């Protein structure tokens, strides 16, 4: 009885320590080390979610020129105040909308920034939502890995996830990846139950079809995850018995899930694929260029093949980083050669591998960048499961070492070393925070207060703004913004389209147009608008002496020249090393 009480006390003590650690790291990354949302995709989804919370449906204040082109080509009515959102998958947006509605974010005035505010309050709400999904995913993966292996391996993986700086950076970005991780983990858990049932000669139908339900939700979180489902579908075709029955059921479930968005896109824009298809032009600058064109972008097969090859090589060379930095996750590939005693463990690893291969193919086609906040990154969904297999392999090797027979910490030395290596970046991060804690005023060229406090005051709610960071203008300033095109010709076409409903009120330019780029890259990305992009910077550092000359540029002068420009009135929004400015069609008046 005493031994049992001691075990219960020890178990309670360990759980209490784990809970305290979890809460502490949660607070660290959502309060003390949080400086605002760091991904434009996360910011974009948040602004769409606010429109949903307001009862405006799936509409966006961030207008892509290619979306206007789709509406024109299909003879759809264009209302710049009600542009349908056809780029993002809807589920994460709907989740954000529910959260924003609960905190009263549908009313912009409820959460306006003050002069001394460093962080937009709603940014933190979005980050907390993402972090909550991350904690949920940790719990699901604990249940899954403890069922595949044991509680010790599951606990190790859970701690590795908690200590992963990469995972926490994703939560701070506002990306849908944490919701995706939760749904994928739930789908994988049910897929494992189906494999278990079949290996035990029971019927796998119910858990297999339930896994299809979660894969459907996953597809509604990010269209790229359809590639993962293709891998699972192929596995189901050849493994589950009776062959083909479960696979057909899975396909039917997926079709039901994606039918709604496809019908929505078709009815709203005349194209079932929406604007999301144009992401196939490649990650980063290529896809951005396609989105900023009024005319349909040319589809280059040779370019697609070249980008796919380049992206595949990038994935191979950066697989550890893409797997969330979870130590031992890449060891999963060594597990493919290990003869596991339980057939279910051996079979399930092939399911993971097939899904991962097809996910990699999809990422190769649509492209990845080396950025840690790449929105098309799907590798991290597999990281906990792969890490579980990796820890299991290390544990098997360790069991053959004499030290493993020792009791206490010495017998678990391999686990301690793994956790120490994983926690090192987190400990370093905490040390840096304690030495120099300073909230950033700008994240990748987005100065929240200049938009929320200043641009909002010099514009009206019905104004249409052309901007180089329209996602940020939509979220922080609560204004409709069109992504600035690369050519002056496209700009005039957009003006002509806008004249029919809501004329363009002004142009917002920030350091986003050149920040982090060398001048050649910046010139390529901005083309005719390059002079306009650099004008605030040159104006600030030359005290306007050279600005007068550059404004004579044939692409810039008709827009902002004080005498002949269509947007001659200027308001400076931010200065120092990242200046931004707003050029208005009418005389600027600051509202209270």
Predicted regions, residues:
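Transmembrane alpha-helix segments characteristic
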Residues: 16, 21-22, 156, 161, ...
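Signature aromatic-anchored transmembrane alpha helix within multi-pass, membrane-resident enzymes
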Residues: 11-22, 159, 205-213, 229-234, ...
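Transmembrane-helix signature of polytopic, membrane-embedded enzymes
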Residues: 107-123, 136-163, 181-182, 202, ...
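Hydrophobic, aromatic-rich transmembrane alpha-helices
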Residues: 141, 234-237, 311-350, 356, ...
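Membrane-embedded, lumen/periplasm-facing catalytic core of multi-pass transferases
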Residues: 33, 409-468, 472, 505-511
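Hydrophobic/aromatic-rich transmembrane helices and adjacent perimembrane loops
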Residues: 171, 176-180, 185, 218, ...
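Perimembrane helix-loop-helix junctions
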Residues: 5, 195-197, 227-258, 263
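Membrane-interface helix-loop-helix junctions at transmembrane boundaries of multi-pass membrane enzymes
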Residues: 147, 198-205, 239-250, 333-357, ...
């Amino acid at each position: 009885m005493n031994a049992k009480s001691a075990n219960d006390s020890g178990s309670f003590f360990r759980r209490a320590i784990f809970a305290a650690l979890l809460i502490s790291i949660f607070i660290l990354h959502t309060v003390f080390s949080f400086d605002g949302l760091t991904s434009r995709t996360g910011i974009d989804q948040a602004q769409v979610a606010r429109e949903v919370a307001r009862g405006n449906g799936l509409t966006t204040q961030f207008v892509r020129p290619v979306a206007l082109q789709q509406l024109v080509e299909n003879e759809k009515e264009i209302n710049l105040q009600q542009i349908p959102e056809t780029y993002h998958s809807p589920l994460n947006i709907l989740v954000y909308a529910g959260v924003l509605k609960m905190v009263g974010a549908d009313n912009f005035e409820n959460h306006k920034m003050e002069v001394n505010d460093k962080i937009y309050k709603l940014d933190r709400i979005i980050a907390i939502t993402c972090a909550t999904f991350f904690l949920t995913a940790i719990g699901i993966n604990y249940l899954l890995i403890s069922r595949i292996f044991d509680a010790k391996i599951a606990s190790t993986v859970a701690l590795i996830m908690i200590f992963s700086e990469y995972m926490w950076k994703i939560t701070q970005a506002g990306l849908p990846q944490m919701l995706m991780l939760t749904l994928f983990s739930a789908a994988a858990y049910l897929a494992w139950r189906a494999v278990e049932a079949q290996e035990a000669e029971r019927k796998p139908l119910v858990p297999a079809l339930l896994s299809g339900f979660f894969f459907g939700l996953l597809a509604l979180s990010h269209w790229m995850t359809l590639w993962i489902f293709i891998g699972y579908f192929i596995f189901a075709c050849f493994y589950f018995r009776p062959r083909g029955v479960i696979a057909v059921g899975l396909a039917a479930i997926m079709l039901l899930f994606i039918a709604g968005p496809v019908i929505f896109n078709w009815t709203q824009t005349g194209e079932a694929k929406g604007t999301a298809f144009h992401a196939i032009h490649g990650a980063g600058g290529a896809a951005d260029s396609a989105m900023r064109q009024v005319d349909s972008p040319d589809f280059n097969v040779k370019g697609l093949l070249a980008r796919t090859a380049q992206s595949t090589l990038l994935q191979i060379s950066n697989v550890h980083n893409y797997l969330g930095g979870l130590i031992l996750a890449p060891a999963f590939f060594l597990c493919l050669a290990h003869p596991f005693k339980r057939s279910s463990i051996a079979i399930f690893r092939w399911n993971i591998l097939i899904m991962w291969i097809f996910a990699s193919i999809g990422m190769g086609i649509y492209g990845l960048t080396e950025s840690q906040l790449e929105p098309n990154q799907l590798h991290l969904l597999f990281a906990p499961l792969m890490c579980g297999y990796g820890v299991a392999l290390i544990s098997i090797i360790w069991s053959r070492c004499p030290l493993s027979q020792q009791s206490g910490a010495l017998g678990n030395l391999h686990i301690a070393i793994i956790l120490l290596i994983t926690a090192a970046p987190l400990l370093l991060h905490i040390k840096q925070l304690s030495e120099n804690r300073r909230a950033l005023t700008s994240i990748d060229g987005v100065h929240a207060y200049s938009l929320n406090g200043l641009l909002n005051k010099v514009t009206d709610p019905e104004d249409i703004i052309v901007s180089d960071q329209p996602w940020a203008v939509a979220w922080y300033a609560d204004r409709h913004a069109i992504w600035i095109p690369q050519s002056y010709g496209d700009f005039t076409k957009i003006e002509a389209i806008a004249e029919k409903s809501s004329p363009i009120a002004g142009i917002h330019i920030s350091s986003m147009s050149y920040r982090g780029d060398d001048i050649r890259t910046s010139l390529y990305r901005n083309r005719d608008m390059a002079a306009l992009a650099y004008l605030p910077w040159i104006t600030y550092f030359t005290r306007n002496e050279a600005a007068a000359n550059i404004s004579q540029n044939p692409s810039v002068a008709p827009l902002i020249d004080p005498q002949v420009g269509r947007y001659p009135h200027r308001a400076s929004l931010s200065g120092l090393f990242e200046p931004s400015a707003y050029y208005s069609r009418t005389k600027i008046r600051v509202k209270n």
